[in-house]
Amino acid sequence: PPPPPSTCRRQRQMCIRDSSNVTTGSVYQAVILKERRGDYLGDTVQVIPHITNEIKARVRRLGDRDDVDVVITEVGGTVGDIESLPFLEAIRQFRQDVGWKNTVLIHLTLVPYIAAAGELKTKPTQHSVRELMEIGLQPDILVCRTEWPLPEEVRRKVGRFCNVDIRDVIESRDMDTIYEVPLRFREQRLDDRIIDHLALSTPDPDLSAWETMVERIKHPGSGEVRVGVVGKYTSLVDSYKSIQEALIHGGIANDVAVRIDWLSSEAIDSQGTSTLEPYDAVLIPGGFGQRGVEGMVDTVRYLREQGVPFLGICLGLQCAIIELSRNVCGLEGADSSEFEPDTPHPVISLLDSQMKVTMKGGTMRLGAY
């Protein structure tokens, strides 16, 4: 049978399933459900061992189900924060369970540059590693975020005070594009160090295609296109991170630079569509609720009448249907039942199967038309 639906992770040739995203809430929910079901036979549920065991089981499940050579596990947050402690303890236990030689711990730290003093400071990295070691985790490799190159003496200092081989102190300097970072890691042989720690045997990588891609990003050969994104949450651009990356990838494929401007649909609703004139194409992404919808509908009408390329995703496509129904099909007052329950023409309506759904999270129907 085909594998379950999965999403290809940006920048990496690997498949990511829903089980690859583990949140604290989902872990606690699973443990509480097991307790209610009687799996713990009346034991008092505790962070250790019940929460940590659930975290470890989720890490192990990925490797067992997909029969992979390596499972990459990222623990977000900052060392020392209470939120990440159960996860770090689970990782400590997991390394003991599978054997230290079968794991490699990479710690991302900050080496800030103090402009007034004209020097890089390693104390944040030292303190971060010390906090991690107090939990029982000794990093094998340190990846140091920095605005400036790390001189040899700074790398030696970090290695000496953090108990790490200087070859395992890796510079992660700010780049023009994030896609250049893997090339800089390769120059420092980060991949070789990981392979050495895990005692694996792999062929040398061929990064020529990646180098070509980075060159296209930095020096596109076919000019620039301006794309406007009209949305409800444009004050926080990360809300549309996947769309932003998809547009950049489209530019790479076509050897053009994509300049993205984020436009508030509420501003268009109140100020008009004149702000749309400079754009070669416009995209309207998804969203929820009535706020800003009329601005999106006005945007669609302007784009249709002016012949500007348009892509509507989720709510964006719903707005296109509403606009077409009102202004082309003559259905006055056409709307979505989500925004106007009493509309005479509900051209967009909630699925019957969703009518009785009251939960907000994890209830959207995906595909299966």
Task: Give, region by region, the residue ranges found by the protein language model.
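Flexible phosphate-sensing "switch/lid" loops adjacent to ATP/NTP-binding sites
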Residues: 4, 8-259, 266-281, 288-289, ...
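Cysteine-nucleophile active-site neighborhood
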Residues: 275-368
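Beta-strand segments within the central parallel beta-sheet cores of soluble alpha/beta enzyme folds
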Residues: 105, 261, 339-341
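A short glycine-threonine-serine/GTX helix/turn-capping micro-motif
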Residues: 119-120, 367-369
